[in-house]
Design a protein with these regions (language model features):
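Metal-dependent phosphoesterase signature
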Residues: 13-32, 57-66, 81, 93, ...
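Substrate-recognition element of Asp-dependent hydrolases with the DxDx(T/V) motif
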Residues: 34, 38-71, 87-94, 137
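Sparse recognition of residues in long alpha-helices and their boundaries
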Residues: 26-27, 50, 83, 153
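Residue-identity detector for glycine
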Residues: 11, 18, 33, 45, ...
């Protein structure tokens, strides 16, 4: 079985200060420490998987295509640095608009990744800046690491056991 680091997108990988929704490529600001931390996680043998709530789709603030453009640009920027994100999963729903099973704190997107990539939850972690990220992790047996929004991702390294 493989091990993985599951990462929330906005507030963990991307700086979301001053904006609740990030849906334009011009708004991409990678948080401090992200590049170095992702390289370290990769060197430790972890797959990197993004799990993100994108409720702005359900609220018709932006589209799935906007989210795909952000992920495509992120993929490009990370690949330049030699970083491979194994997969990007996102929930397009919002609880104010419709109920679903994939919006964190529900663990469906994490469960899909666990099954698809044969990941051992006991050796894997979820890093998020919101209580719901950690709740989703706990529901499937992952260790959850809560950081402050836009915190330097290198700060979590002492909490990751390879």
């Amino acid at each position: 079985m493989q091990k993985a680091i599951f990462l929330d997108r906005d507030g963990v990988l991307l700086n979301d200060a001053g904006q609740y929704y990030i849906y334009k490529t011009d708004d991409i600001i990678i948080n401090n420490g992200v590049i170095d931390a992702l390289k370290r996680f990769t060197d430790m043998g972890f797959l990197l998987i993004v799990i993100s709530n994108q409720g702005g789709i359900a609220k018709q603030i932006y589209t799935k295509e906007d989210v795909e453009k952000i992920h495509s640009e992120l993929k490009k920027q990370f690949e330049i640095e030699g970083i491979n994100i194994t997969e990007y999963y996102y929930c397009p729903h919002h609880s104010d608009v419709e109920k679903c099973l994939c919006r964190k704190p529900e663990p469906l997107l994490i469960e899909k990744a666990l099954a698809r990539f044969n990941i051992d939850p006991d050796k894997s972690f979820m890093i998020g800046d919101n209580k719901r990220d950690i709740e989703a992790a706990k529901k499937v047996g992952l260790s959850g690491i809560k950081i402050k929004p836009n915190q330097n991702l290198l700060d979590v390294l002492p909490h990751i056991n390879a």
